[in-house]
Amino acid sequence: MNPIVRKMSPTAPSMIRMDHTLVMSHFHKLEPDTPEGVRAAVVRSICAALEIHAQIEEEIFYPALRESGVESPALQEAGPAHDEVRKLIERVRALNGQRTAQDNALHELMNAVMHHVADEETQILPAAERFLGPERLSDLGARMTERRLELVRPRAAELAADMARGAPAKTALMAVGALVAGGLLMSRIGRRRGMHL
């Protein structure tokens, strides 16, 4: 694990909570008078953020909880909840250009996400904080950050463009800067390890 990534990374629960906040803030940008180009960018951002978030949880966070003996109905339901979110994302994408139908699908997606967020933040994350301890949660956060950078890197330009379209100018510049910095960091890490990323 790269020590720079480790130092810069939030703990796993903090990262998950930040992801939840980001996605919910994107949902709140979708107003009836949102211009179509901005709306499309926000919808793409929501879908990408949810897909990346779910993949990181499934690959790193949930297995670590299970290995540590955490048992929770919410943890057992997390996989099916992610599957439901993925199906709704596909529906949202398939309805592109059909505003009313897509709005209805987005509403269903938002409800599914809110239910999952509530379960995660009231049951799964508190259990992780009780059972895993600060050092393990920091390690998981660093691994999740590294994986996020790997997943974002091939789509960085697309994600940055959507963030820029869907955000105020100051926020967009900060987001683009963060994505560029993340890409440079991953390239540097890859060179040090002798990999081409």
Describe the residue ranges of each PLM region.
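Small-residue-biased structural context
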Residues: 1-197
